[in-house]
From Swiss-Prot:
Its EC number is 2.1.2.3, 3.5.4.10. This is Bifunctional purine biosynthesis protein PurH. Pfam families: AICARFT_IMPCHas, MGS. CDD domains: IMPCH. It catalyses: (6R)-10-formyltetrahydrofolate + 5-amino-1-(5-phospho-beta-D-ribosyl)imidazole-4-carboxamide = 5-formamido-1-(5-phospho-D-ribosyl)imidazole-4-carboxamide + (6S)-5,6,7,8-tetrahydrofolate; IMP + H2O = 5-formamido-1-(5-phospho-D-ribosyl)imidazole-4-carboxamide. InterPro entries: AICAR_Tfase_dup_dom_sf (IPR024051), Cytidine_deaminase-like (IPR016193), MGS-like_dom (IPR011607), MGS-like_dom_sf (IPR036914), PurH-like (IPR002695). The IMP cyclohydrolase activity resides in the N-terminal region. Residues 1-148 form the MGS-like domain. PROSITE patterns: MGS. GO terms for molecular function: IMP cyclohydrolase activity; phosphoribosylaminoimidazolecarboxamide formyltransferase activity. GO terms for cellular component: cytosol. HAMAP family: PurH.
Length: 530
């Protein structure tokens, strides 16, 4: 049922005042009376918009430094009153019906994110009256409209103009859902913040008592896309994103052209983009089934692409390609003339490249923007009945942190190759082995239960493409528990090995490297990826 409700009286109280003056002016022009509080009321008055202070309406002043403003029966009775049922009692107590509530909440997340934020600062930014009004209006959505997002202001005015200054029940219900989502997210942020203080109980936000993991884990994501299916065709799926993601990512990327991204497209594109971010030089990463099958650097992205493709042209078919520089016309031409590709993602795409890619209508082209700093988000893995939550693996050793444990020191070229393939190995499914030489992958062995077999696969892949393993560096995402992996690497022609170290048999493994005249480098950091 349409069940329209006319808008005659509004209550406006916002912390984020984006667009509020224009919205209030539009409401006034449509005959709506406005109640408001504090800073919002002052702003509207300064703009010559007729407004009644809530304290004047209730006859009760704001008090306790603004802690108590709207918590009054004349406010909540006007919001919660059921039209046609509570009219008599509202009239008896001088309560005017409020038809639309426009509220957004104190900036708690922004406050606690600031350096030096104290518990007292956080507490004063916990909104009480705001969520109460939001929930009251959302509960009474049958009669009252609640607006918590500035991007809905134009929508409200447009519907009023086409619906005799009224809003439909469908619109009110939709806005009520957004309101409950808003307060749920807000309360979750507060719970997370306080939960990280256990067992210090807020006495000090520093030191050993602080935990980055709260007692309960509250996170909210917004649905960005319904999908045809999930990882497999019998699985239903949707894509959810954080409310305000800051980092350039597949979640924030703009799709320039192509079919809708599939579940697997998104997972693989994320893997490719996060890998290519590790490199400062022009780089290309080609991913298949969430594993890099070719990674290379070059003087430009065209050269990087040619070299990355050379590693494994077979696996590159139907893959995902990521760049850390603008996709130009020459590279777009090379890709479209050479191979079938599902997705290309880059920080930016030239107009000429867009025109070239347009000939491949199904090819998904994404532009993610530049990235600068890495975020401190969590990695979340669902298990049956629970969640595994950890820091994102953003660790990467520098040259100064490496420990050469072999008798032979690596040459400058070997050291450079070792650092390159170590970065790649971080993004290969465990057990991961990567061969590289001259800033390109020569062979990749991924996802084997045996580290030795991963090494063998890397060698087989290199041989299949006619690439020379002799003189390569080899990276292993975790330590070698036995010397057999080193013996196999030496037989293949590997001259330098980079690995975390830390095995009970490190001495045996190092001795094997020395026997073969290999250089061996310990990173002291493991990069398992499951």
């Amino acid at each position: 049922m349409n069940n329209p409700r006319p808008i005659r009286r509004a209550l406006i109280s916002v912390s984020d005042k984006t667009g509020i003056v224009e919205f209030a002016q539009a409401l006034t022009e449509r005959g709506v009376d406005i109640l408001s509080t504090g800073g919002t009321a002052r702003l509207l008055a300064e703009k010559n918009i007729p407004v009644t202070e809530v304290s004047d309406y209730t006859g009760f002043p704001e008090m306790m430094d603004g802690r108590v403003k709207t918590l009054h029966p004349k406010v909540h009775g006007g919001v919660l009153g059921r039209r046609g049922q509570d009219d008599g009692i509202m009239e008896q107590h001088g309560i005017n019906p409020i038809d639309i509530v426009v509220v957004n909440l104190y900036p708690f997340a922004e406050t606690v994110a600031k350096e030096g934020c104290t518990l007292a600062d956080a507490v004063e930014n916990i909104d009480i009256g705001g969520p109460t009004m939001v929930r009251s209006a959302a509960k009474n959505h049958k009669d009252v409209t609640i607006v918590v997002n500035a991007h809905d202001y134009d929508r409200v005015i447009a519907e009023m103009d086409t619906n005799d200054k009224s809003l439909t029940q469908a619109t009110r219900f939709d806005l009520a859902i957004a309101a409950f989502e808003h307060t749920a997210s807000y309360d979750g942020m507060i719970a997370n913040y306080f939960g990280t203080m256990v067992p210090s109980y807020g006495e000090n936000k520093e030191g050993d008592n602080e935990s980055k993991f709260p007692r309960t884990f509250n996170q909210q994501f917004e649905k960005k896309q319904d999908m045809r299916y999930g990882e497999n065709s019998h699985q239903a799926a949707a894509f959810y994103v954080e409310a305000n993601p800051e980092e350039a990512s597949v979640s924030t990327a703009r799709q320039i052209q192509g079919k809708a991204l599939s579940y697997n497209n998104i997972a693989d594109t994320d893997a490719a983009l996060e890998c290519v971010k590790e490199f400062n030089e022009p780089a290309c990463v080609i991913v298949k089934h969430a594993n890099p099958c070719g990674v290379a650097l070059g003087k430009d992205v065209l050269e990087a692409y040619h070299r990355a493709y050379q590693t494994d042209p077979t696996s590159a078919f139907g893959g995902i390609i990521a760049f850390n520089r603008e996709l130009d016309a020459a590279t777009a031409t090379a890709i479209t003339e050479r191979q079938f590709v599902e997705v290309i993602i880059a920080p930016s795409v030239s107009a000429e490249a867009i025109e070239i890619i347009a000939a491949k209508k199904n090819l998904r082209l994404l532009e993610c923007g530049e990235w600068s700093t890495k975020t401190t988000e969590f990695d979340i893995k669902r298990v049956n009945g629970g969640l595994l939550v950890q820091d994102r693996d953003q660790g990467m050793v520098s040259e100064d942190e490496l420990e050469v444990v072999s008798k032979r020191q690596p040459t400058a070229e070997e050291l450079k190759d070792a650092l390159f393939c170590w970065k790649v190995a971080k993004y290969v499914k465990s057990n991961a082995i990567v061969y590289s030489k001259g800033d390109m992958t020569i062979g990749v062995g991924a996802g084997q239960m045996s580290r030795v077999y991963s090494a063998k696969i890397a060698g087989i892949k290199a041989a299949d493409e006619g690439l020379v393993v002799e003189g390569c560096a080899m990276a292993s995402d975790a330590f070698f528990p036995f010397r057999d992996g080193i013996d196999a690497a030496a037989e293949a022609g590997i001259k330098c090995v980079i690995q975390p170290g830390g095995s009970m048999r490190d001495d045996e493994v190092i001795a094997a490297a020395d026997e073969h005249g290999m250089a061996m480098i310990f990173t002291g950091m493991r990069h398992f990826r499951h």
